[in-house]
Amino acid sequence: PFYSDKYAKIGFQVNELFDDELLKEKVYHVLETKNILLEHLYHKDPINPEELLATLREYREMVAPYVCDVSAYLDKAIKEGKTILLEGQLGTLKDPDHGIYPMVTSSSTLAAYGAIGAGLPPYEIKEIVTVCKAYSSAVGAGAFVSEIFGDEADELRRRGGDGGE
């Protein structure tokens, strides 16, 4: 739902939490679409705009101490010679452009996307370190190209302590 909301431009961005008039307008606008889907597609009760506003205002207070201009924050850290650690997950085969479509995730899993997601210029990525398990695992339905079945799979799960994430 996050990526569909983002690209349909009906999601919320953190900065919108801090402008109460804009937030209220956005809540009512978003719920015009969301409530139609909830009621007619999912057969669920509509979301009350005033209740959602109250919840979002609570979230605003929770995140306020941690909100900043991330690009400026990281730029300052780079200029001060600090080390920045970016984390990615899943790997290339789950990337929506380079993975095994349609068994992919919604956002890029490639190391190069780390700079984009963090708001850093790509030339600031000086080193990429990859950490991976000795074997791949996945949850959910869909093809898993390197999947092993039977006794061998059970033995890997037992030794690796992997019951599915």
Feature locations, PLM:
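Non-transmembrane, aqueous-exposed alpha-helical and coiled segments at domain scale
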Residues: 1-165
